[in-house]
Amino acid sequence: MRLVGFAPDPPPHPHFHLPPYPLPPSKKPSHQLNVPSGDFKTAGFNLTSNTILSVTGTIWSVQSLDNWPKVAALPSYDSPGAMPGARYQALVWFINATNITVSGSGVINGAGSWWYTKMTNNARPHIMEIHNCTDVQVTGVTLQNSAFWTLRPIYSRNVWIHDMKILAPWPGTGEPMGVLNSDGIDVDSSQDVMIERNYISCGDDHVTVLAGAAEAGRAFNMPTRNVTVQDNILGTGMGLSVGSSVSGGVQDVVFQRNTMSEDVWAWGAGAHVKTRIEYGGFIRNIAYLDNIFKQVSTAGLWIETGYQSSGNCTAETCTEIRDIVFRNFTVLDATSGPGSILCYAERPCVNITLENVHMSSSTDPTRGWGGCEHVASGTFIDVTPAGLQQMCGL
């Protein structure tokens, strides 16, 4: 798989660039595993380099803890909420590999509802983990009913996820039992990642961009950079996020031309930039461009520096947040209001831009922004509801 550049529109600010497009593997794979029509049960298994996994039937996770392999803790995580200690291997696991394609019209089912009855901590397995790999393509398949985050590239480079489906039940569905933290795609300490033309319906963030947690993440020091998330259709879920685990740093991320559809009830924020007290790291050069969210039940746009945490931070443990752009950003029905920008007093946000940002609410058309705190600089052009710039003191 190689990368080819392209000429984007003018960048949203001087230091921003769009990632290049990855192309299919240029080296012919030497192995192919075909899953024909029918149902096939398995515990977690590995894919090695130069392999195609072609799925026509359905791969099911076996419902047995005894037969499921465990793998070591992740070196960039050490907090209680971020998978400490041994964890269960992903159903489909690629590790230390290159030139892998997963394709086909079939289904990979993680039996998430069963797993959630056995354990509620974050040792539950992903459906697919791309771990320290290069040149990986996932296309066509449906990943369904994950026990935890559905698809996770971590410590990887040159990953292309396109034209596939993720169907993970959110906790209110009831059939099957919803699974908390059933994110769609989590890009973690990885570079050169393209996520495009997918349908994602899940029980947490549709797509989020991460880079390790707390002291372990800062010490591991592997940023996520050069990520594009574009032309996706989003069903139920919690929107397009950066964070909250960004201790290794996140930069150069574009979310563009994505649509949260109106035919399902959506919950959570549309765009959510979130950090935790004492995690540190940085979030730089993030752009939300030409996105439409047809219904969100909380904030349409939310920068939140105290996500699930409280207290004070230091210069090292306050996350740096700068150069965040929301342009041509529309929320047709933000039922709980347009949102807020709440930054650290100890380390204010720098260069926040909102341009052609419009939100409305069917439940309270007069409701304004929730607040704006500690924004050192920014630009606000054609924003409704009005009043955000004044709240920010700019």
Task: Identify the function of each model-found stretch.
Residues 1-394:
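Extracellular/periplasmic carbohydrate-active domains that bind, remodel
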